[in-house]
């Protein structure tokens, strides 16, 4: 049997919305249409927020949207003013990041050198800086799902890491030490072993 591919459903669940509404003691019964309308309103709101944030991300020549991009979008758009408290703790976009984008190939190298690790995917300079700002697993998974160009960009990352001398990680060879037991073994009793050796010789002959 062919496996059915699960259809991606991005709708906000009306049943969950209804439960959230009913947690308020002042709300009694909820008509069936109300959670559906709220679900659609949430979709439209999220669509407008993400479109604006996408514009900010693209203006920075970044491939991954980060919390810093969302923060800048919320601060720029007056209609999102009510979200400013949510992003107050998010670090601002660095002004130096814009200079790295105009430098071309120099940007990614500068972004990766301080504190880079072998796990990070390659990309533009802003991408590596954005990854430092956003440490969530979901954002890193999103980067692993990017197009094949990310796989090609990983190869330039190898030379900067290869420039670090690997000899520092090798430990000097230790001299061979035979295993010695911390407890002394008792010597075998000499009496019974002698007749057994004679018996074994009889079987051989």
Curated annotation (Swiss-Prot):
Top-level taxonomic group: Eukaryota
Single GO BP term: negative regulation of transcription by RNA polymerase II
The protein's name in its UniProt record: Dr1-associated corepressor
The family this protein is said to belong to: Belongs to the NC2 alpha/DRAP1 family.
Transmembrane segments: none
GO molecular function, one term: protein heterodimerization activity
Natural source organism: Rattus norvegicus
All copies of domain Histone-fold, residue ranges: 14-77
Basic and acidic residues bias spans: 98-108
Comp. bias intervals (Acidic residues): 138-155, 196-205
Pro residues bias (residue ranges): 172-193
Disordered: annotated segments: 91-205
One Pfam family matching this protein: CBFD_NFYB_HMF
PANTHER family per the UniProt record, alphabetical: DR1-ASSOCIATED COREPRESSOR, HISTONE-LIKE TRANSCRIPTION FACTOR CCAAT-RELATED
InterPro entries tied to this protein: CBFA_NFYB_domain, Histone-fold, Transcr_DNA_Rep_Reg
Post-translational modification: Phosphorylation reduces DNA binding, but has no effect on heterodimerization and TBP binding.
